[in-house]
Amino acid sequence: AQLQNPVGYELQHK
């Protein structure tokens, strides 16, 4: 999932 949406991943996993 992180690979498909790196933006959301960064926002949740900064």
UniProtKB/Swiss-Prot annotation:
Superkingdom to which the source organism belongs: Bacteria
Expression triggers: By elevated hydrostatic pressure.
Extra remark beyond the main annotation: On the 2D-gel the determined MW of this unknown protein is: 65 kDa.
Protein name: Unknown protein 6 from 2D-PAGE
Species for this entry: Fructilactobacillus sanfranciscensis
